[in-house]
Amino acid sequence: MLAYCVQDATVVDVEKRRSPSKHYVYIINVTWSDSTSQTIYRRYSKFFDLQMQLLDKFPIEGGQKDPKQRIIPFLPGKILFRRSHIRDVAVKRLKPIDEYCRALVRLPPHISQCDEVFRFFEARPEDVNPPKEDYGSSKRKSVWLSSWAESPKKDVTGADTNAEPMILEQYVVVSNYKKQENSELSLQAGEVVDVIEKNESGWWFVSTSEEQGWVPATYLEAQNGTRDDSDINTSKTGEVSKRRKAHLRRLDRRWTLGGMVNRQHSREEKYVTVQPYTSQSKDEIGFEKGVTVEVIRKNLEGWWYIRYLGKEGWAPASYLKKAKDDLPTRKKNLAGPVEIIGNIMEISNLLNKKASGDKEAPAEGEGSEAPITKKEISLPILCNASNGSALAIPERTTSKLAQGSPAVARIAPQRAQISSPNLRTRPPPRRESSLGFQLPKPPEPPSVEVEYYTIAEFQSCISDGISFRGGQKAEVIDKNSGGWWYVQIGEKEGWAPASYIDKRKKPNLSRRTSTLTRPKVPPPAPPSKPKEAEENPVGACESQGSPLKVKYEEPEYDVPAFGFDSEPEMNEEPSGDRGSGDKHPAQPRRISPASSLQRAHFKVGESSEDVALEEETIYENEGFRPYTEDTLSARGSSGDSDSPGSSSLSLAVKNSPKSDSPKSSSLLKLKAEKNAQAELGKNQSNISFSSSVTISTTCSSSSSSSSLSKNNGDLKPRSASDAGIRDTPKVGTKKDPDVKAGLASCARAKPSVRPKPVLNRAESQSQEKMDISSLRRQLRPTGQLRGGLKGSRSEDSELPPQMASEGSRRGSADIIPLTATTPPCVPKKEWEGQGATYVTCSAYQKVQDSEISFPEGAEVHVLEKAESGWWYVRFGELEGWAPSHYLVAEENQQPDTASKEGDTGKSSQNEGKSDSLEKIEKRVQALNTVNQSKRATPPIPSKPPGGFGKTSGTVAVKMRNGVRQVAVRPQSVFVSPPPKDNNLSCALRRNESLTATDSLRGVRRNSSFSTARSAAAEAKGRLAERAASQGSESPLLPTQRKGIPVSPVRPKPIEKSQFIHNNLKDVYISIADYEGDEETAGFQEGVSMEVLEKNPNGWWYCQILDEVKPFKGWVPSNYLEKKN
């Protein structure tokens, strides 16, 4: 630290400098600790360098590790597309830079007194003696030129003293131009340039804010839209027009040898062609090399109007040179009256200067004259004044200028020895207006635009920062290398951490495919139009549509989006007609927020023989799951087809002794038969679940748990994701000739990556349903599996069944009993007791007009219940849709059948428990054997994947291959606070998989997830807890609400044990194009790929097979379809 330090720094003004180039400096008054004051001058680039040094030296204070800890002030960003040396830019930056200086010196001493800050504010020699604006002696003679005095009384010593700065003309670039030589400049449309020289070849020497070079004049236009100086018309007496002469007096004198040459010529000058030219359009004239042409009209755009062989037209000026006949006349008039010439080529011809390598024309002129060197050609030599007396430059001065002048080769593009051949021979493009030139069109903008959005909530703690919620659209104005972006969100602007902002392709409904650029926002399911099913002997669902060509749509992120339509999936007849299923339930009478997207229909791609012979596999989201010929496999069903957000899949057990169906039977047909029989047997038998590995997933802390009883002779559907399935009696185990339909093609809707559920402690004691997404979470290496299963079982048995049943009733929000009079054809979204009164467990603010807001503890009257998790309620005089997990039934309305159903099937439950547990355990061990063999996992994204936001609700959708799919509105995550302490839940963190078993803390709408993780030991025994809880008392009706909305935007997993490795070779085909990024693999439609790993979050690790060189990478599972 330095005792001598800066006390205050104030930026008072801006000042323009022209050395070494045009720029502005900021005048800063610096007050030091010894009360002395100094005035220093710093340009913006010095501020920028200081800022980068400070951010590198103090990364913590610069907010690179944690943006909230940043204390180093922000600096205005660089000007990318405007010139930083114009005054309005400098003045606009004046106040921000003043605030930056003031804040910088007030930082803690270890920053404000560091060496970098001290050196920046320390006075330098140029601060003590600011440079004077002496344009005549400036080093950059290619930019600032001296104006020679017109008065004949001026002498050599007064030339520099009375010099005035030349005013350069500014032109606007009308179209983009990419340089083709090092001596040229690239131009951007709309850019303003200073024209230093206008050459008759059509190539102008211009200056931008950063560099100088040659550009075609046809790409430039005067700021007022005119081109007054473009034509060089000579009068009848041979004099240059007054307007042209005024311009030449300012510009062309720079590039002559300083001589005032009298140019007596006729109106039509004779030129000789130096190269052949072929006409490109009707108004041009072609010619051979060495022919003489007459120039009728000249201009500075490089195209002259000539006459050749009686025809008139345009020709490139760079292909012409002055005829030899005119040279002697010019040379005689060197000492004559003053006249201006417009081209350095004429002077070079006049002085008989030819390149030694140029053998086309012999040297001309008098032999007594010494040839002029390259360096001399660019020197401003003073020749004859108007009175004829020579103004000679001393020899010492001439040699000094020759050494230091930068104006050499690129000055005269037609000089072969001092310019690139291309500039001498290549004509510039013609202009459209009078010359017939069509300017090149700028490139088309990209067809897919990128938009930015916030991925989590951020509260700014700095003055010029901006606070925002997750899921908001942001417009990025400036990107800082320090990790902060200047963004606009709504009407507000400010700096935001780049790690909280992600990009995606702008939704465009006209595009066929929907390919989001990041894996954190999975693409939506491609919907298709339903049509009438066709009769199929192999078996297709008669009541549902056949596959059509899919039509892809972009997701609508601001509304609740679900990958299905609101039509209930279960189509069945009342008692008796088990196979037809033609009757469609009525639609709800009000539009639910859940209905936004159609579902896609796909064709079941595997025959029953393939299914029977293929070993079972467990898939998530996309997986086509072959079913084995056993009945105990159905015991993994959660039976929760009505609860929103239900996403469960049964784990099949092979070769069960209770399977009545022969191996040759069509399992798909059997499943369709069970769908039709679901309602018939739901009140005829009390069924208990006997599988010891059951997992119920729910996102709601207030969800209820229910158990299904199963007798020895009963059957259950193989997946609870088949909406409307109930436990069916054994009568459906044999094939019915009336039921020849397999799974509907529409049941294979392409899913969105569904959220991982959060386990509820209350359900762990009574829930007896199986969910593969939860089962995956419990899979661990083989050595740990058996002990974990048995240990958790004994651990779970310590809790009495009464507690589980009681907690289940407390957490339930919509348990309404079904009686035997309930017709099977009643839609699932409408239940008995719809007029029940419920109490709100938390306040809710509506997001859409169709919703309703209510405070905490209010009584509402439920009018209608939709399976999406949204209930139509009346609160006071208002009616609207409300999320069901905000509602809790009153105590007197809880069913008292909860304790009656659990005892009926205990005996049969215990008989098959050990058998099914052993078989399922073997299957899990086999999977974990593969899990242990593959330890290498792809890199986990370093950026937070998008935060999780509260949505308006999730819904149970049509299943595809026995898997329930859910799509939600990616706004934020809302997890209601647990009403009881015995609820086991999870905390959501950034950069963590939702499978982490943590302690839940209530997170409000649009909040950021940074809660602390609690011990994960409580969740280790969850896999067997369900098995030990099967004797607990619980209601018969599986109406738990698992509808807590969870955003599909999620990270890739962290723990390797969460991967499910398939020991079979699974080949899938992509159903749409997908553009990958640094973390995921891109592919085209119709590409075959082998699935190597299936991750619960919906991303599969595949090997692409159709490419020339197969490669591996992560792909979204909802872009894949099982290969036939």
Swiss-Prot record:
Presence of the UniProt keyword Lipid metabolism in the record: no
Region Disordered: start-end pairs: 414-443, 504-672, 692-830, 886-952, 1020-1050
Protein keywords: Cell junction, Cell projection, Coiled coil, Cytoplasm, Phosphoprotein, Repeat, SH3 domain
Pfam families reported for this sequence: PX, SH3_1, SH3_2
Subcellular locations according to the entry: Cytoplasm; Cell projection, Podosome
Modification sites for Phosphoserine: 405, 420, 546, 566, 592, 643, 764, 766, 812, 993, 1007-1008, 1029
Biased composition (Basic and acidic residues): 575-585, 713-739, 912-924
SMART domains to which the protein is assigned, alphabetical: PX (SM00312), SH3 (SM00326)
One of the record's GO molecular function terms: phosphatidylinositol-5-phosphate binding
Biased composition regions of type Acidic residues, renumbered to the chain: 607-619
Domain spans labelled SH3: 166-225, 266-325, 447-506, 833-892, 1063-1124
Disruption phenotype: Shows significant decrease in total cellular reactive oxygen species (ROS) and in podosome formation.
SUPFAM superfamilies according to UniProt: PX domain, SH3-domain
Free-text comment on this protein's domains from its UniProt entry: The PX domain is required for podosome localization because of its ability to bind phosphatidylinositol 3-phosphate (PtdIns(3)P) and phosphatidylinositol 3,4-bisphosphate (PtdIns(3,4)P2) and, to a lesser extent, phosphatidylinositol 4-phosphate (PtdIns(4)P), phosphatidylinositol 5-phosphate (PtdIns(5)P), and phosphatidylinositol 3,5-bisphosphate (PtdIns(3,5)P2). Binds to the third intramolecular SH3 domain. Required for interaction with RAB40B. The fifth SH3 domain mediates binding with ADAM12, ADAM15 and ADAM19.
Xref: PANTHER family: SH3 AND PX DOMAIN-CONTAINING PROTEIN 2A, SH3 MULTIPLE DOMAIN
Function comment: Adapter protein involved in invadopodia and podosome formation, extracellular matrix degradation and invasiveness of some cancer cells. Binds matrix metalloproteinases (ADAMs), NADPH oxidases (NOXs) and phosphoinositides. Acts as an organizer protein that allows NOX1- or NOX3-dependent reactive oxygen species (ROS) generation and ROS localization. In association with ADAM12, mediates the neurotoxic effect of amyloid-beta peptide.
Protein name: SH3 and PX domain-containing protein 2A
